[in-house]
Amino acid sequence: AGGGTGKSMDIDEYDVMPNPYKQLVVWNPEAEEILGGYRYLLGTDVRMDEQGHPILATAHMFDFSQNFLKEYLPQTIELGRSFVTLEYQSTRSDAKGIFALDNLWDGLGALTVLMPNVKYFFGKMTMYPSYNRRGRDMILYFLNKHFGDKDKLVVPKEPLLIETDKEELENLFCESEFKADYRILNREVRSLGCNIPPLVNAYM
């Protein structure tokens, strides 16, 4: 999808630091193939720097409230660098791609079974600049309306600006129920020749 560095080995300081990030790998034992994966770190394993800031792969993007650090982080897994191997991506017509994301979620579910204290997943999701800007604005508005962080637990250092007229979006997403607004979002994004990104759908 265009993510990562494009290098044959995509390793950074978070992979080699003391108590580094771990890898969740989804394996197809019949074909002996890697299906996909995530990089993750348990909140209980997060260390703080000299200024008291968490050493996280997302720390350059977000400011974390004390409430989040004390009450949520110990019960959280930070996720990042998700991928589905090309042969298993949903754009492929064969059956391989149909259940790839489901298998990935099964892997995340397995983590919560192994670590029953975990209640939350946290991380960033990439939407590329090539994605239709109006479509992106509609998705952002919809997510802020129905899943907004009212307690300011995690705040972006550089918030994404919605360029589409706010009143227009308010009139478009005028329903009180999530499902009704979602139907509008899906219809409008498709009318632009786009699809809602799979991870956006999955995380909702």
Residue ranges and their predicted role:
Residues 2-6, 33-37, 118-120:
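Short secondary-structure capping/junction motifs at helix and strand boundaries
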Residues 16-25, 48-49:
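A short helix-loop-beta-strand connector motif used in the catalytic cores of GNAT acetyltransferases and
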Residues 19, 31-32:
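Core nucleotidyl-transferase/polymerase catalytic module
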Residues 20-22, 36, 75:
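Residues that flank catalytic or metal-binding motifs in active/ligand-binding sites
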Residues 25, 32-42:
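Conserved beta-strand in the GNAT
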Residues 46-204:
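Acyl-donor binding region in acyl/amide transferases
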